């Protein structure tokens, strides 16, 4: 989309672009020339990283439900269910892992990062919750860089092995199930 003073039908845009929503993240930025990152995300996604973003993130769930797994200040995992039609404002710096199941769509808006403003992608052990791996990036292309970080983790057995309990996270990630 170019900078215009015209509205468009978002549901039609999703229908016309849904083939671009591919795992592991299933995201597509709507406008490239904005000071915001406004993107559509579809399910099912295939990710288990936790994103630590220096910006607040606004979630609007268009179809189905989204599950945002967060790490609390006490280090506990907590799942926020964002139901169809709901909005959710995730505060900056909260480690979170958004999970989307099949046939779901949501809009996420966050601000573009300033030069030198870094963010992390972190993996925690499924068994003992120990931090296994962290990647710090200067985010400039959210569609490309998140996929690269996930692929790098998934393809390296050494970093998928927990140094605390020995559990080895599988290379492939199945569809997330809310427990």
From Swiss-Prot:
Its cofactor is Fe(2+). GO terms for molecular function: 3-hydroxyanthranilate 3,4-dioxygenase activity; ferrous iron binding. It catalyses: 3-hydroxyanthranilate + O2 = (2Z,4Z)-2-amino-3-carboxymuconate 6-semialdehyde. Binds 2 Fe(2+) ions per subunit. GO terms for cellular component: cytoplasm. Its EC number is 1.13.11.6. Fe cation 1 binds at residues 51, 57, 96. InterPro entries: 3hydroanth_dOase, RmlC-like_jellyroll, RmlC_Cupin_sf. Fe cation 2 binds at residues 125, 128, 162, 165. It is an enzyme of class 1 (oxidoreductase). Pathway: Cofactor biosynthesis; NAD(+) biosynthesis; quinolinate from L-kynurenine: step 3/3. GO terms for biological process: anthranilate metabolic process; L-tryptophan catabolic process; NAD biosynthetic process; quinolinate biosynthetic process. Substrate binds at residues 57, 100, 110. SUPFAM superfamilies: RmlC-like cupins. Catalyzes the oxidative ring opening of 3-hydroxyanthranilate to 2-amino-3-carboxymuconate semialdehyde, which spontaneously cyclizes to quinolinate. This is 3-hydroxyanthranilate 3,4-dioxygenase. It comes from Bacillus thuringiensis (strain Al Hakam). The lineage of its organism: Bacteria, Bacillati, Bacillota, Bacilli, Bacillales. The gene is nbaC.
């Amino acid at each position: 989309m170019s900078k215009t003073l015209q509205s468009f039908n978002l549901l039609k845009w999703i229908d016309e672009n849904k083939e671009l929503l591919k795992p592991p993240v299933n995201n597509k930025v709507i406008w490239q020339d904005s000071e915001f990152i406004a993107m559509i995300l579809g399910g099912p996604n295939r990710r288990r990283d936790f994103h630590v973003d220096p910006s607040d993130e606004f979630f609007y769930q268009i179809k189905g439900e989204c599950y945002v797994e967060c790490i609390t200040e006490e280090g506990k995992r907590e799942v926020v269910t964002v139901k169809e039609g709901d909005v959710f404002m995730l505060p900056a710096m909260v480690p979170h892992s958004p999970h989307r199941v099949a046939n779901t769509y949501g809009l996420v808006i966050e601000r573009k990062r300033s030069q030198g403003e870094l963010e992390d992608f972190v993996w925690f052990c499924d068994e003992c919750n120990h931090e296994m791996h962290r990647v710090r990036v200067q985010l400039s292309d959210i569609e490309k860089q998140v996929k690269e970080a996930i692929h790098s983790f998934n393809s390296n057995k050494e970093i998928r092995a927990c140094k605390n309990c020995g559990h080895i996270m599988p290379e492939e990630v199945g569809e997330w199930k809310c427990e």
